[in-house]
Amino acid sequence: MLLKNASFYDDEVLKRADIRLKDSLITEIKENLSPINNEEVIECRDLFVLPSFIDLSVTGLEGYENLKQKAFKGGVGLLNVFNCDQSGIKNIMAIKNNQLADIATLKNKGGEILIAPSDAFLELISHYAKSYNLPLLISLENSFEALNSGELAYELGQNFVENAFENTRLVRFMEVSRALQIPVLLDKVNSITTLKLIKAFNDLGAKLQAQTPLSHLVLDESVYEDYEPRFKIAPPLRDKESQNALKEALKNNEIAMLTSLHASKNSNAQLFEESAFGCESIEDAFSVAYTFLVQKKVISFQQLIKVMAINQAKFLKLNAGEVKENQLANLMIVDLNAQTRVSNQNSPFYGLELYGEVQRMILKGQTTFIKENACKKS
């Protein structure tokens, strides 16, 4: 496959050239390449090529194939789906049914990342991560309270998460990372206090990174005043001041990765109190991130690529995440000028007008998604 006249970033440098894909890899990047042996040619003039996103925090309550197609539409090529044998990233859930999993066997079967949903069996899980050189993702089970503690929770009479206790379990993992020198990714980080603790432990030698939900950078808790079930997200959204602080942290590279936090709504309840928690957002991941983070100048386009592709690939030790020769050909082709509107009524972003749309997804050199009438062959 030959991508003609592609615009892309090589590190921080904006380039325009042709990109040849062969045998799952990006094999050649040069100007004025000619097709060979009936090679498929895709015209990318006026479009942008970037690495496909990697999402490390997805909950799949729907069929995996359906979830995967939604992800492709949102520019996400690789998914880490909790409790799913088909997950594109082979994960090891360290605890199942309150018992320690057979981590050694699961690692030998191809497990790529170890996930801890609680601090139970902390010592054993930590030693497995170190012994098998497994990246460790801490994705603590949610408390499933609708709001964070504060004035709005009292005003609306909703159950709330008590902020005073949210970091008590995370600190144990932070100290383990420092003491054992284990790379640890803390999932669903949405508190400035947590980020300050991460920085403090990293200053002491820990190897911690933070992953924050995209929704918490775009929305704040004021949306709860409408009692719409689509905003019932776990963990809950923060107040505006906290949200602005998260944006500053992202801008200052204190947040390493972003996640759609996608979880399908397993309920059609009309009342906020009776509805299920969830965040149906992955099919609009690229457009939401581009619109609210890049166009609104929270971060640069290059930094968006880092927090949604490059850093994840490095954490997983994958040969992917950048548009470079000899990297895996996991790419998306996008139209940055296209305008769309979120149509999924279960999405927290429903009705929002977005900029930037995925035209084609390519995984290991093969097209996995193409928008109708997009990326015409030349």
Curated annotation (Swiss-Prot):
GO MF annotations, alphabetized: allantoinase activity
Top-level taxon in the UniProt lineage: Bacteria
Bridged cysteine pairs (disulfide): none
Keyword Transmembrane helix among record annotations: no
GO cellular component, one term: cytoplasm
Entry keywords, A to Z: Pyrimidine biosynthesis
Pfam families for the chain: Amidohydro_1
Keyword Cell membrane attached: no
Protein family (similarity comment): Belongs to the metallo-dependent hydrolases superfamily. DHOase family. PyrC' subfamily.
Protein name: Probable dihydroorotase-like protein
GN (gene name): pyrC'
